[in-house]
């Protein structure tokens, strides 16, 4: 074997592991301590030096964006994984439950996220596109299987999720939001359509 090549591969693998450790540590630190947590604290939790953190992320905003981007990608991709193991209607329900649970976990970094995901940002457009694609797939499959009624607009479901997430932070929010989601899903399963047409 070519030893320099082996060393280079090992170095790249170490770099990937360090980046993943930093992202995992940052997510937990932001959730527990808020978006103002020190970068030194994130590095300490990840078990790396502050120089390693800065080699991967130039600023607090950069690591916050990377955490958010990874979470959005993981949650969006879970739509396909859920469809492989659940009936389409249950997959849709579970995906929406996870969306609400994620809203609860990111509460500590919500103010900082607002500054990097405003309506005009590339990151906002990117995350919106992934979510729209995921819920569109789930609604399509659940409609085709007969698990939910016809005529459901995926954008309505995303809007409903946004409304349910609005009260995050209240003591009873999560239990109440999940109950309301169950009611919403019961309505989607009701087969006598009373829906107004989706707006053009």
Model-flagged regions — what are they?
Residues 1-6, 133, 137-145, 170-200:
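C-terminal peripheral helix-coil segments that are non-catalytic and often amphipathic
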Residues 1-45, 62-65:
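Basic, helix-initiating cap at the start of DNA-binding domains
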Residues 24, 89-104, 133, 178-186:
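Amphipathic alpha-helical segments that line or abut small-molecule/effector binding pockets
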Residues 47-57:
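Short hydrophobic/aromatic patch on the recognition helix
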Residues 57, 64-71:
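Alpha-helical DNA-contacting segments of helix-turn-helix folds
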Residues 66, 73, 77-105, 120-123:
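Hydrophobic alpha-helical connector segments
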Residues 73, 119-155, 159-170, 175:
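Amphipathic alpha-helical packing segments from all-alpha helical-bundle domains
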Residues 111-121, 197-199:
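Short linear capping/connector segments at secondary-structure termini
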């Amino acid at each position: 074997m070519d030893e320099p090549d082996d060393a280079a591969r090992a170095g790249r693998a170490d770099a990937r592991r360090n980046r993943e450790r930093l992202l995992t540590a940052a997510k937990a630190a932001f959730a527990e301590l808020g978006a103002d947590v020190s970068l030194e604290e994130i590095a300490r939790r990840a078990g790396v030096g502050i120089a390693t953190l800065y080699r991967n992320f130039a600023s607090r905003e950069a690591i916050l964006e990377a955490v958010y981007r990874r979470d959005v990608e993981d949650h969006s991709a879970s739509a396909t994984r859920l469809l492989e193991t659940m009936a389409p209607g249950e997959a849709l329900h579970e995906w929406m439950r996870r969306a609400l649970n994620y809203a609860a976990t990111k509460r500590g970094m919500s103010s900082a996220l607002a500054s990097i995901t405003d309506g005009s940002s590339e990151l906002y457009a990117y995350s919106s596109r992934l979510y729209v694609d995921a819920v569109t797939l789930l609604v399509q499959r659940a409609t085709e299987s007969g698990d939910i009624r016809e005529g459901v607009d995926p954008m309505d479901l995303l809007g409903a999720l946004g409304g349910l997430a609005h009260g995050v932070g209240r003591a009873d929010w999560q239990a109440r939001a999940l109950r309301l989601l169950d009611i919403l899903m019961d309505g989607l399963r009701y087969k006598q359509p009373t829906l107004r047409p989706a707006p053009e």
